């Protein structure tokens, strides 16, 4: 009997590409709506999964949120469920006649677990089948052929680390979400989501907003002198106006050059993209979640390397010059800047890992072959890659120190002499400052002197970029999950905008948890669990042991909660999130309501005595902002749709304008 070879990939389009690379006689087979691929001459089958085809869940008898005790929920034995039955059926069918199974899922923790889940299905019908694993970082012919020429063993420790994360996140997420949702009265579609990583991340945003709200600006004073062609500044700033005025009065009509320096400064090139830096740069154009989805599509279609990586050093196995030469057909000017050098040496970051290289282009794409957003991400990856190989930028840097009656002034100037990598990486603006050539002893006339009163500014809100960086610093989540955490906070209406602003519900949830179960909101506990999962991957700890430790940790948190206070504070806080302002007719509270027909509107809390209402758009996610209308005691409203944010402004002003236009 001829035995078959079964190759398992993570997604269908990867299966299709790998099949076409390895075999010349590929036929597409179908079962229901699922396609898979067969090479008759090799009797090889390539089956693409849909990511996880098996999911973990709680037993059905624990589905009732209000009746199931939380301690029982967190101690429950989780059950596995096959969620893609057709794919499972195909795997079993082929596995029965297979003598070799190759796992070709993505090479990371999640990919290893996805492969192991499929293997368990295979081994349920063929327990003795030979199994191997191939690892690759790009879906290109060269990479795939190289990977299949040197298969390795499946890394069960790596898969178990992902399994531990899956179990812990499910246990913590379900338990805490039920805790908060039930005690706030927010269940059904409107439930309040809480999670192991999500909640400490949300606290960062809420705490920053509180810093901004509580910030008290302080006045300070700075002294400037204007000269022909430049402005100089006194190096010190003063909290006392009197002290500043005293010094200001000493300034004469001229200033003498005490020191003038001029030097050439080389500016280093950007380092190769790892996931964190890629998402931070991509967030200039779109949400990190969208950027990662597009990067994965480009990877599976052979245009860029694997986008989930910590590495910032190109391995010597990558033929950098070959890639640049190939890219010259689409980026000729940029490629020429790189190729015109006598020697090409790439920049290096601090982190070097052996699993995947930094993100780099693996195929040449033309603008017309990709969607607008796909091209934006592809171009970003290409330009970053070329910039890491380009010459350094060179600046002419100047500095002058001047003196006027004992009052010192300093000015700096810089001009870009050789653009180098800056001619390629167009996302980083070169800020130039004029400063003429001077020499020691020159006496310059002061055209104007200024004493400026300024105020200290509050810290800035977190942008997608700065939040990802802070999450990495605090070990919140992983390179593969941070963008998903941020997206979850947006979709659950905890945060909006970019930079991010928290909703009233976010304040309520975090403030209540800080008082009743602060551990949940701190990064320490989550970082500890991340370290434990690393130990599983290294084979130093067992998955059940880490999961049980996390259950015990959560149990202690639940037992320390004051449930009466939790319930009271949550219900009061959640109510605030629906309050839009004061009713102009009776002074009651205007709140967001829903009609029997399911339409949302703004109504008065004193209904039926007061029937004042305002219409609202029916599509998109509604956000009540902290900004209040200048004319009415009503907060402004924003709507988030697929196209972005729409600032509706004051709903009452909006309604009055509409009424005026349509009268």
Swiss-Prot record:
SMART domains for the chain: TOP1Ac (SM00437), TOP1Bc (SM00436), TOPRIM (SM00493)
**Enzyme Commission number:** 5.6.2.1
Q: What class of enzyme is it?
A: isomerase
Q: What organism, scientifically named, is this protein from?
A: Archaeoglobus fulgidus (strain ATCC 49558 / DSM 4304 / JCM 9628 / NBRC 100126 / VC-16)
Q: Which gene encodes it?
A: topA
Q: Which residues form the Topo IA-type catalytic domain?
A: 155-558
Q: Which residues cross the membrane?
A: none
Q: Name one Pfam family in it.
A: Toprim
Q: Give the quaternary structure.
A: Monomer.
Q: Which HAMAP family match?
A: Topoisom_1_prok (MF_00952)
Residue spans annotated as Zn fingers (C4-type) read: 583-610, 629-653
Q: List the SUPFAM superfamilies hit by this protein, alphabetically.
A: Prokaryotic type I DNA topoisomerase, Zinc beta-ribbon
Query: Which residues does this entry assign to the site Interaction with DNA?
Result: 52, 165, 169, 308, 492
Family (UniProt) = Belongs to the type IA topoisomerase family.
Give the record's GO biological process terms.
Answer: DNA recombination; DNA repair; DNA topological change
Binding residues annotated for Mg(2+), in chain numbering: 10, 106
Mind telling me what this protein is named? DNA topoisomerase 1
- Name the residues annotated as catalytic in the UniProt entry: 306 (o-(5'-phospho-dna)-tyrosine intermediate)
List the GO cellular component terms: chromosome
Domain of life per record: Archaea
Which reaction equation describes what this protein catalyses? ATP-independent breakage of single-stranded DNA, followed by passage and rejoining
Where in this protein does the record put region Interaction with DNA?
A: 193-198
Q: Which cofactor does it need?
A: Mg(2+)
**A Gene Ontology molecular function term of the record:** DNA binding
